[in-house]
């Protein structure tokens, strides 16, 4: 409560009780329970599970305040590993219990389950979604510009050249929304910069 988390190129900062309050700085150390890297690129708070997800240039970290320690996820030789350590953006999809993320150089988008035991030495399996030109149900474009979760738990993914891909909470295939000059209520361009949701 009443906390601000700040990611920087030199550690993770936790500010308590406003600008004149206390603060803590978390940096990588020799301990396995420290943050995976000092270069923090994005943050996502999981309100359902009271934990912080941290994107860095060297993998993912999950911080649980009640335990005051980090669980780190990096690439491994296994097929269900995360595809790259240099993570760029995060989204916690609270209803589906997934963490969505993009990386700096690998195409497409990725997700993994946020439901796993912190004491486990194995990270949760990661899923990678990439455009397949012969599969119309694959993601529309590998250039991901923005992604959000709506209140129903569906994920909307904006792309650089091919509109919006939509992934239902209950399905595993993408449907697409693209510019159609015959549809006056549709997208006005296939180049998507940002997506947001409205509250009633």
Regions found by a protein language model. Give the residues of each.
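Carboxylate-rich, polar loop motifs that coordinate divalent cations or form catalytic acidic clusters
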Residues: 1-200
